[in-house]
């Protein structure tokens, strides 16, 4: 709803064109036509990506795993790593509950446990998990009676994002009253369970969302999801060779892990095999943070980055 925000989107469009993306700046009328459930009062314009969409996370993950196996990879499930010990020649012994694996290279892609796995090699990786909440609504006639799926909508003013979820809606928030999670470390026993809902934290964001998307007032809430994901202090992933350790690589703090995973994996593979990635990924280089960084600094900057997501 401000000229500054629109100017930012115009600058983003220029960046997208440089990268070969055909995004467009559109006005309120076009926004309303594409997303009839959006209240465009006070909206000056938006940035539209006609190729935007979403994938099934489970199916995509299994497709990656199948492709890896076809290329000769072996995947060991439920096999915790206990130690990572360097040898004088730069190779590594990875000690697991099922024995020790001798590896020329190792990659820390441990997600929520990246800090703990890094500590096994004496490395501090500056990242921190944050709690994040989103809502899934009951079925909505205005959604499932459409001939085509609703587009994703990101509302910077309301600090929210919305997309169609089957016959209802999914709406998530980057609230100001946010909380770091697992300050003392991610429990090894943490699995796929969710965290307790903290609806009071997102009450202001929900109230704004009901004005931006009035249809939500008539929609029942089917599920409230609260789960953790990781951020680096500047919001970018930590990718590449870890300074001071031979053949130890990082692919962590990938906040949008599912959507960024393919690009991070490709860049890291090129780096390991060819000696450098084919694209400039300086903004993701794990080496951009020096020895000066501390857990306290990381935690505060991660909170700030979450609050400024939009």
Please name every model-derived segment.
Residues 83-196, 204-212, 291-310:
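Flavin-dependent oxidoreductases
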Residues 4, 37-43, 85-93, 231-235, ...:
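A short, glycine/Asx- and small/polar-enriched loop/turn
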